[in-house]
From Swiss-Prot:
Ubiquitinated. Deubiquitinated by USP4; leading to stabilization and expression at the cell surface. It is found in: Cell membrane. Interacts (via cytoplasmic C-terminal domain) with USP4; the interaction is direct. May interact with DRD4. Interacts with NECAB2. Interacts (via cytoplasmic C-terminal domain) with GAS2L2; interaction enhances receptor-mediated adenylyl cyclase activity. Residues 377-389 have a biased composition (Basic and acidic residues). This is Adenosine receptor A2a. The gene is Adora2a. Residues 401-410 have a biased composition (Polar residues). Glycans are attached at N142, N149. Belongs to the G-protein coupled receptor 1 family. GO terms for cellular component: asymmetric synapse; axolemma; dendrite; glutamatergic synapse; intermediate filament; membrane; neuronal cell body; plasma membrane. GO terms for biological process: adenylate cyclase-activating G protein-coupled receptor signaling pathway; apoptotic signaling pathway; astrocyte activation; eating behavior; excitatory postsynaptic potential; G protein-coupled adenosine receptor signaling pathway; G protein-coupled receptor signaling pathway; inhibition of non-skeletal tissue mineralization. Residues 30-39, 98-117, 194-229, 286-410 are cytoplasmic.
Length: 410
C-alpha cells in the first residue's frame, strides 16, 4: 500500500467518522427518548470519534510524511490519538458498568445512576485520558536521544517526525497497551459475561416461579438486547485496535525479528481509525430508536422531505382542530413533546374569540383560520412525575418510554 493510497483511505475514514458520529449526537439532541444516562456515555464516545476524524487522522497523515519538526511538537501530534483512544476505552467501560447495574440491581438503578453523576464521570474520564495519553510529553519520550541522521537531515534541535522515533515502545506496550487498553477490555469482557449470566438466570426464574413486582420477561429481554448491542461495539473496538498493539509487542519483545513492512503498518493504522466509523452503523442496525431518528434527520434535513402527520407516530407537521372548550393536546414533533393551543394561548375553559379552541367536545369553530393554531414547546417531565405510559396514552398524551425500549429488536 503506497502512501498516497493510505492518505486517500484515511481522508475517507475521517469524513465518514465525522458525519456518522455527528448524526449520533444530533439524534440524541432532538429525541427526548434518547436522552438518558447511558446515551450520555454514547455521546462522549461519539465525540471522541469525531475528534479522530477532525484531528487525529490529519495528525497521523502528517506524521506519515516524516516531516522535520521540533521533537515535542511531533510528540504532541503522536500522542493526541492516544488521548482519544483512551477516552473511547473509558466511555465503553462506563457503558458496561451502567448496563451491569441496570440488569443486576434494576430497582436501585435510578438512585445510583443519575445524570449529574454521569456527567461528572465523563469529565473525569476525559481528564484521565489526557493525563494518560500525554504522559510522554512529561519526559517519557525519545527526545533526549541524539539521532545523527535526523540532525543531518533536519538540522540541530529538529527530528524526522515519525511515531516510533519520538514515542518509546516500552511506553506503548507496558503503559498504554497492557495497563490502559488490555486490562479495561478484559474487565469489560468479564462485566458482559456477568450481565448475560445474570439475565439468563433471571429468565429461567421467571419461567419456573415468577415473583410479584419483578420485571416482565419482555423488559428483561430488551435489556439483554441492549447489552448485546453494546458488547458488539466493545468487540469491534478490540478487533480494530488489537492488531496495531500486537505489532508493537512484536517490535518491542523481539528485537531480532524483522520490522513490520510499511504496508502492514498502514493497514493496522487504517483498521484502528476505522473503528470511529462503525459505531453509528451498529446503533442504526441494532437500536430501533436511533434508526428511526437517523431516518428522520436524513429525510428532513438532508433530503428536505416533510413527513406528514401520522396518528400514533412521532412526527407532526400540521394540525387542524376546532372545538368549543380549551384543552391541551400533547403531540410529539421530531421527538420533542409539544403542546397545541389555539391562538398561542394558555388553556382556557371558555370559548375563544377570533379563533379555534381545542377540547374534547365536537363543536364547530368560531372566526379565524387554521393559521391561528400554533405549536408551543412543552416542558418534558421525567418518568417519576408520570404514573405510567399506559395512563399517558389513555389521556391522549405521549410519555417517555424506558431506555430499554430503544433497543427493542427490529
Amino acid at each position: 500500500m503506497g502512501s498516497s493510497v493510505y492518505i486517500m483511505v484515511e481522508l475517507a475514514i475521517a469524513v465518514l467518522a465525522i458525519l456518522g458520529n455527528v448524526l449520533v449526537c444530533w439524534a440524541v439532541w432532538i429525541n427526548s427518548n434518547l436522552q438518558n444516562v447511558t446515551n450520555f456515555f454514547v455521546v462522549s464516545l461519539a465525540a471522541a470519534d469525531i475528534a479522530v476524524g477532525v484531528l487525529a487522522i490529519p495528525f497521523a497523515i502528517t506524521i506519515s510524511t516524516g516531516f522535520c519538526a521540533a521533537c515535542h511538537g511531533c510528540l504532541f501530534f503522536a500522542c493526541f490519538v492516544l488521548v482519544l483512544t483512551q477516552s473511547s476505552i473509558f466511555s465503553l467501560l462506563a457503558i458496561a458498568i451502567d448496563r451491569y447495574i441496570a440488569i443486576r440491581i434494576p430497582l436501585r438503578y435510578n438512585g445510583l445512576v443519575t445524570g449529574m453523576r454521569a456527567k461528572g464521570i465523563i469529565a473525569i474520564c476525559w481528564v484521565l485520558s489526557f493525563a494518560i495519553g500525554l504522559t510522554p510529553m512529561l519526559g517519557w519520550n525519545n527526545c533526549s536521544q541524539k539521532d545523527e541522521n535526523s540532525t543531518k537531515t533536519c538540522g540541530e534541535g529538529r527530528v524526522t517526525c515519525l511515531f516510533e522515533d519520538v514515542v518509546p515502545m516500552n511506553y506503548m506496550v507496558y503503559y498504554n497497551f497492557f495497563a490502559f487498553v488490555l486490562l479495561p477490555l478484559l474487565l469489560m469482557l468479564a462485566i458482559y459475561l456477568r450481565i448475560f449470566l445474570a439475565a439468563r438466570r433471571q429468565l429461567k426464574q421467571m419461567e419456573s416461579q415468577p415473583l410479584p413486582g419483578e420485571r416482565t420477561r419482555s423488559t428483561l429481554q430488551k435489556e439483554v438486547h441492549a447489552a448485546k448491542s453494546l458488547a458488539i461495539i466493545v468487540g469491534l473496538f478490540a478487533l480494530c485496535w488489537l492488531p496495531l498493539h500486537i505489532i508493537n509487542c512484536f517490535t518491542f519483545f523481539c528485537s531480532t525479528c524483522q520490522h513490520a513492512p510499511p504496508w502492514l503498518m498502514y493497514l493496522a493504522i487504517i483498521l484502528s481509525h476505522s473503528n470511529s466509523v462503525v459505531n453509528p452503523f451498529i446503533y442504526a442496525y441494532r437500536i430501533r430508536e436511533f434508526r428511526q431518528t437517523f431516518r428522520k434527520i436524513i429525510r428532513t434535513h438532508v433530503l428536505r422531505r416533510q413527513e406528514p402527520f401520522r396518528a400514533g407516530g412521532s412526527s407532526a407537521w400540521a394540525l387542524a382542530a376546532h372545538s368549543t372548550e380549551g384543552e391541551q393536546v400533547s403531540l410529539r414533533l421530531n421527538g420533542h413533546p409539544l403542546g397545541v393551543w389555539a391562538n398561542g394561548s394558555a388553556p382556557h375553559s371558555g370559548r375563544r374569540p377570533n379563533g379555534y379552541t381545542l377540547g374534547p367536545g365536537g363543536g364547530g369553530s368560531t372566526q379565524g383560520s387554521p393559521g391561528d393554531v400554533e405549536l408551543l414547546t412543552q416542558e418534558h417531565q421525567e418518568g417519576q412525575e408520570h404514573p405510567g405510559l399506559g395512563d399517558h396514552l389513555a389521556q391522549g398524551r405521549v410519555g417517555t418510554a424506558s431506555w430499554s425500549s430503544e433497543f427493542a429488536p427490529s
